[in-house]
Amino acid sequence: MTLKTMNDMQEDVDRYIGQFKEGYFSPLSMLARMTEEVGELSREINHVYGEKPKKNEEADKKIEEEMGDILFVLICFANSLDVDLSESFDEIMHKFNTRDKDRWTRIEESEEST
C-alpha cells in the first residue's frame, strides 16, 4: 500500500462520493455523522482501556477502524465545504508552534536519544 497525501485522500473520497446521485450530505447531517463515529470510537476506547467490557454478543471492532471512519467523514465534511485539509493542517500547526511554543516542558536533546 502506498502512502497517500491528504490531497490524495480528499480526491479519492470525492471520486467515491461522486458516483452517487445523492452526493455529500448537508453540513448538519455530516456533523451528526461525525458525532456518531466519535461515539463509536469512544465506546471502543472504553472497552479496551476503560472499565466497561464488551457484552458477549457485541462484535469486535478495532480502534483503527473507528479512526478510519472518523477520517472518512472528516474528509467528506471538508470536501463538501471546499476545505483543503492540507492547508488547514499547516495553518493549525503554525498556530500551535507559535501560540504554544513555550507552554510545555521540552525534551532536552540528551533525553531524546535515550
State each model region's role.
Residues 1-67, 71-114:
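Flexible "arm" and connector segments at domain edges
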